[in-house]
Amino acid sequence: MAYTTEIVTVGTVALEHYLPAQETANRKILFVHSSGHGSWMWKNFLSYFAERGYDSWAINFRGHHLSEPVKDWETVGVNEYLEDMENALQRIGGKVIVVGHSMSGLLILKYAESHQVAGLIVSQSGIPKSLMQKKGIALPGPMSGKGKREITAGAIIPIKDRELVKAMLFDRGNVDEETVDLVLKMMGKESARVGGEIMQMELTPEKITAPVYVLGFDARKIGMELPVDLNKVLAEELKAKDYKVIEPGGHNYMLEHNWQDFAQQFEVWVNAQ
């Protein structure tokens, strides 16, 4: 199905909108990006769902990609991103499935504690520090060497080492070099404050009434040595009925060769809601 695209601005935040020629699905979809990324990371999924009649959107948090730059990253915390999400969802309207990846997985869960959404897809999220401690999971130490992130003026600086980006974000042999070029070009700064606040953030699962689909991941692929899949722990805490491990696939599976396999999995779940 044909579709049109546009950039919709809500305050200082920009949304990418893929509008199908005929909206045949009874749910809209909002894709939320991960740390240092933007709506561009969801380009394949946006076109996939728009072609199938879904009114599809992707947000850029303040200071990211198409949104207005942030003057002071130290003023940007979790509450600011939750405000961006609320403004975006008010603009979109209707019944919306919200997809969060990595950093934004916990953000969309926190949002859903106090807002109604049609469903939540939580992809390769972290879990709160308190839940790790409750389950007796040892926290990994900070990364060293090339993997250590530089922080300047409250902002986490994006990694520009090509081989490190490939190792951390993609499965070996599952991504073309043009996609790696895109990621290196497009990755931007992230709020260090948000990263710290997310780790300390508490979730109240009983407040989340929307159906939840949790997608797990082998954290060793991004240099984290953990005894369990954190997303399985999260799914159990949320009492989520739907849980699946993304495999084969790297952290940025939505940009890998087999991205369509996962888009189809999303579609099956969305259609069941």
What are these regions (language model features)?
Residues 34-38, 102:
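Active-site glycine-rich loops that stabilize anionic/oxyanionic intermediates
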Residues 46-70:
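Conserved alpha/beta-hydrolase
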Residues 64-96:
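Active-site loop/oxyanion-hole signature of alpha/beta-hydrolase fold enzymes
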Residues 99-104, 108:
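Gly/Ala-rich beta-loop-alpha elbow adjacent to hydrolase catalytic centers
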Residues 120-152, 194-195:
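Flexible "cap/lid" loop of the alpha/beta hydrolase fold
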Residues 208, 214-216:
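Short beta-strand/loop motif that positions the catalytic acidic residue
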Residues 216-249:
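Conserved loop-alpha-helix segment in the C-terminal half of the alpha/beta-hydrolase fold
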Residues 249-260:
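Catalytic histidine-centered segment of alpha/beta-hydrolase-like enzymes
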